[in-house]
Amino acid sequence: SSASGASDVLGALGVNLDLEPADVARVFHEVGLTFVFAAKFHPGFRHAATARKEIGIPTVFNILGPLCNPVRPEASAVGVSNLTRVPQVAGVFRTRGATALVYRGDDGIDKMTTTGQSHVWEVTQGTIREHTVNSEDLGLAKARPEDILGEGPEHNADLARSVLDGDAGPVRDIVVLNAAAGLVSFALANDPTEVERGLMDRLAEKIALAQSTLDSGLAQAKLEQWVAATQS
């Protein structure tokens, strides 16, 4: 977690983000994932890009981005840094009839955190359920804020590579926790009865899945496939 955004880090990892919408769709069909760059799909956003970087703090664009996803995915996992905005974002997903996990760490980051508790709003079938998640209850060691603080794109790309290489530690822990949130949302969209099971049990299962995907090398292989597809 840092001032360096996802697009910056993906670029440092070799993912070509300067793709037209048709190629973004092609990459998705070839690889199974893709990156929807706001500057390409919402050209108006680019006029605020420089100011956002200069300000260096979250703005309304951090909230608008996930809500303006042109794909309109049936399942979403979205972090919001402003606590008062979290229920509002959850309400948008409810109005759309979508499934989502919307969350904020008590340390103020727009992620599920490993430094303490996270507040989670689970949206499914027009209802919103609120949860509190302590990562230690999921078997993840408590981290210090400085343990998960990133820097520039190259530094964060190196951290990503170390996680993909199987290195253990606080960075891997927060990665698998947030990956689990996305997997829980996806499972819930496919089977709404999943909501009847405890969120902690579902998160624990998906953390195990994320860990095995890293340890097996499948995540590393998928990144390499993704990079190649965006460069072709």
Q: Can you name each region flagged by the protein language model?
A:
Residues 11-18, 23-232:
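Glycine-rich anion-binding loops and their surrounding alpha/beta cores
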